[in-house]
Amino acid sequence: MLAPKHRLRSTSLFGKTIRNGRKKGSRTVVVHVLVGGEGAEALPAPLQEAATAGPRMGLVVSKAVGNAVTRHNTSRKIRHAFRTVLDEGKLDFPAGTTLVIRALPKSAEASFEELVGDVRSCIRRAFPR
């Protein structure tokens, strides 16, 4: 399970991350990354605080992935894949980083190892050099 401090729950932050963040994709997922709470000043005060906390991840799994059971299993695998990448400590997330991971239909058939590799790769490529 993902710790509450790493969960992205605000609709405003979801939208802002998808609209203004960098997007990188793979065969199984698309990752949107908004670094350092960029644009947080335009949010209401309670959300500004959330936008500057350390990496928060939201998940989008559409009906194109499969039925409810398939979507739920896929979201659990992706959430765990993100947690694995986070726990590795190899990626240095700047304060206020928000990520939205969108599952593609192929993610339902992918193994956990594939998902970890794709999530790690997309996050690495999305960060500015």
Stretches with model-predicted labels:
Residues 1-129:
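Positively charged, solvent-exposed patches that mediate nucleic-acid binding
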